[in-house]
C-alpha cells in the first residue's frame, strides 16, 4: 500500500508546485482530476466527480494556450512520479470512458506544443 500512497502524494505535491502561464492553473487541473485518483489506483466504478472534473477541464480550456497548459501540467506530473503502466493506461482511458474528447493523450510522450 505504501508503494501506491507515496507516488500519489508526490503526484499531488508536484501538481501544487507546478505553475502554468495559461489561464487554467495547475492547481485547477489538480482540483478537477483529484477525484480520479481513487479509480486509477483502486479500480472499480469511475466516480461521477472524476468525469465531471474532466468535462470541466475540457470546457474551461478553450484556447490553444489553455489546452497546452493543461497538457503540460498532466505531462509534467506523469513524468516526475513513479507509476505503474497499469495506472497510466487507466488514466489515459478516463476521457473516453467519461465521454470527453481531449485534444491530447494522457501520456508522458505527448507533444503539448502541437495542440491547437
Swiss-Prot record:
Cysteine disulfide partners in this protein: 26-73, 36-50, 51-98, 71-112
PROSITE patterns xrefs: PLANT_LTP
Superkingdom classification of source: Eukaryota
A GO biological process held by the record: lipid transport
Keyword Aminoacyl-tRNA synthetase carried by entry: no
Signal peptide start-end: 1-22
GO cellular component assignments: plasma membrane
Record-linked InterPro entries: Bifun_inhib/LTP/seed_sf, Bifunc_inhib/LTP/seed_store, Plant_nsLTP
One Pfam match: Tryp_alpha_amyl
An example molecular function term from Gene Ontology annotations: lipid binding
Keywords linked to the UniProt accession: Disulfide bond, Lipid-binding, Signal, Transport
Keyword Transport (UniProt): yes
Record function comment: Plant non-specific lipid-transfer proteins transfer phospholipids as well as galactolipids across membranes. May play a role in wax or cutin deposition in the cell walls of expanding epidermal cells and certain secretory tissues.
Homology family: Belongs to the plant LTP family.
PANTHER family: NON-SPECIFIC LIPID-TRANSFER PROTEIN 2-RELATED
Name of the protein in question: Non-specific lipid-transfer protein 10
Organism: Arabidopsis thaliana
Origin organism lineage: Eukaryota, Viridiplantae, Streptophyta, Embryophyta, Tracheophyta
Recorded name of the encoding gene: LTP10
Amino acid at each position: 500500500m505504501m508503494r501506491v500512497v507515496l507516488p500519489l502524494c508526490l503526484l499531488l505535491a508536484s501538481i501544487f508546485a507546478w505553475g502554468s502561464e495559461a489561464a487554467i492553473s495547475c492547481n485547477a487541473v489538480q482540483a478537477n482530476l483529484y477525484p480520479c485518483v481513487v479509480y486509477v489506483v483502486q479500480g472499480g466504478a469511475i466516480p461521477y466527480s472524476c468525469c465531471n472534473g474532466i468535462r470541466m477541464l475540457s470546457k474551461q480550456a478553450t484556447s490553444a494556450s489553455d489546452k497546452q497548459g493543461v497538457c503540460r501540467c498532466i505531462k509534467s506530473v506523469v513524468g516526475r512520479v513513479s507509476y505503474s503502466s497499469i495506472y497510466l493506461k487507466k488514466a489515459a482511458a478516463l476521457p473516453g470512458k467519461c465521454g470527453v474528447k481531449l485534444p491530447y493523450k494522457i501520456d508522458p510522450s505527448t507533444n503539448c506544443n502541437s495542440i491547437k
